[in-house]
C-alpha cells in the first residue's frame, strides 16, 4: 500500500506562503492533491479491511459449524465384549493371587 503523506497534525499546522493576491495557488493545489491521495489510500485500506473482516467472519462461522458437528457425533464406546473380556481377565488374576496368598496360609 502507498504510504500516507500527511498526518492530521500536518494538515492542521500547514501554512501557505502568501503572494500578491493571497496564498500561492500552486502550493495550495499541491497540498490539496496530496490530501486527496491520502483520502483515496485510506478508502482503499478501509475497503480491504472490510473484505478481510467478512472473510474472517465466514471462516469463524464455518469453523464453529465444523466443531459443533464434530461434537454432536457420538463418541464410539468400547464394545461390551471387550469390557467383559477385560473384566474376566481381571477376575482370573485376582483368583490366582488369592490362591497364592490363601494357599500358602493353609499350608502353614
Swiss-Prot record:
Role this protein plays: Divisome component that associates with the complex late in its assembly, after the Z-ring is formed, and is dependent on DivIC and PBP2B for its recruitment to the divisome. Together with EzrA, is a key component of the system that regulates PBP1 localization during cell cycle progression. Its main role could be the removal of PBP1 from the cell pole after pole maturation is completed. Also contributes to the recruitment of PBP1 to the division complex. Not essential for septum formation.
Family: Belongs to the GpsB family.
Disulfide bonds: none
Keyword Hydrolase on entry: no
Protein name: Cell cycle protein GpsB
One record GO biological process: cell division
Protein source organism: Streptococcus pyogenes serotype M1
Gene3D superfamilies in UniProt: 6.10.250.660
InterPro entries: Cell_cycle_GpsB, DivIVA_domain, DivIVA_fam
Complex formation: Forms polymers through the coiled coil domains. Interacts with PBP1, MreC and EzrA.
Cellular component, GO annotation: cytoplasm
Coiled-coil annotated spans: 32-69
Alphabetical keyword list: Cell cycle, Cell division, Cell shape, Coiled coil, Cytoplasm
